């Protein structure tokens, strides 16, 4: 039996309180919270927001999404642009371009008809035979295609005018690079020419106003390639690699502002004296010739160049020498293409990018060997090491892979009867490439054209580009040139186009109503007027105030209110694209070129997308509003004579005939009105 004392001792004993580590701790319920609770550590970690992402625009309290500012979105560090989509599926081949069709308009042709017409265009584009069945479909749908082309051209014109700033937004980077290139060119001009004051001496009419009173034709004849100096690219087939375009998109500034070596003086003084014994001599570089032929056509073309008139003391004949024009002070289509062409030329000049032929001034041709990675062995301790300065800019590195060619040709102007005038002209230009190792087959021309509306198709070439390509093919005596079309948005290749003299002349006639024989005839009349100007040094200038004239400016010793200084003219304004964006310049879409957009989307050029079920969409008829009849005084009702059955049939027949005539008249009036509106658009 237990005693009472032992029971009391057990009662006073302490109970087990657990491990001392867990004493004075909160209840387990505190740690047993759900992770959806706002005080939970996991909940706080998962819902933490970076301060760079959480901006003032997104900190407002609310359950609905109110607005989104693109400035608040994260940018791609490679190109500093906002990604259009947060994700991209690289497992499937998706198109980068899509035809802008928010109103969901569809073509009058079905899928099979559009496919047949596309096969015809692709066959013509690649100079391949065309299937007879496709030709039948092409001819049967000619009227539908023509009507739809007009509607699509008007639709794309309205689309560009409404979104012009968005479409030409990628042009900002090209404008920034062009400004740096312009500054380098202006520094060279300031070092070459003194800061003299000029004033207007006389005026000369531009080429469109230099028309002969008598009917005459002009042509380029007796073309001879006198000499080539420098390195020319050896290129059997023209192909612009995608890797090069991708590099240029990220490093355009590095390659476009690289300087080139000064061109060699190809036309010797003794050659000029020999030619002056027979008649007048004109020295016209390619850029100067194009300035005379296309001045005032676009806002981003050169407007000034130096002109020197010298009279031979022996023969009394004149040597009229034009210098290269000043760089344009406004940015646009042509300055964008110029920057990209310069950058691409500097990129392929790097070792290992292309093969080159070296042309000596004596006419010798040799292939340039590939430069090794190291000229001498690393064991040679006596080798000369020339470190490059850290602060040396890429523009200070001269590019040696450039060339200059001298071409002599005769501008022959034939009038009525046996009347004929010949002008001996020497032109200098750069050869883009040669096809053979002997250098006897030069490539006529190579353009890099930027497509401003890649979602709509391939644009037609500008008048300046067409005339430039035509002149280069003539002077090089080449059968074919080349035009590489790439997208302005992302520098993706769109089309490799072949250029021929026939196609260039046809485009000039169709799009710009320009005839090259007539333009050359106007050039003959201009050179005749230039022969009457006294000898001396002049500055030939174009001003928008005098749209039909060239201004001949001479140096003046005393400054006057009408005079201007040369250096001030070059530096008074910074090149920008404001004038280009404010003008109504527009390049229509070519209806015959099938580019990357059309091949990926199976879309006919200048056509709306076809219905997915293969059915064509009938165009709605134009509804002409019927004028309300004017109120007239009530006429006293007369008793009508009952007609016979024959008279009733004849009356109904005449009513139907009149109704059809009125319907045809309404359709004709609507078609004429639409045609007039489209002609206004095409003439912009």
Curated annotation (Swiss-Prot):
GO terms for cellular component: super elongation complex; transcription elongation factor complex. The keyword Transcription regulation applies. It is found in: Nucleus. It comes from the Eukaryota. Signal peptide: none annotated. Residues 69-91 are annotated as: Disordered. Component of the little elongation complex (LEC), a complex required to regulate small nuclear RNA (snRNA) gene transcription by RNA polymerase II and III. Component of the little elongation complex (LEC), at least composed of Ell, Eaf, Ice1 and Ice2. Belongs to the ICE2 family. This is Little elongation complex subunit 2. It comes from Drosophila melanogaster (Fruit fly).
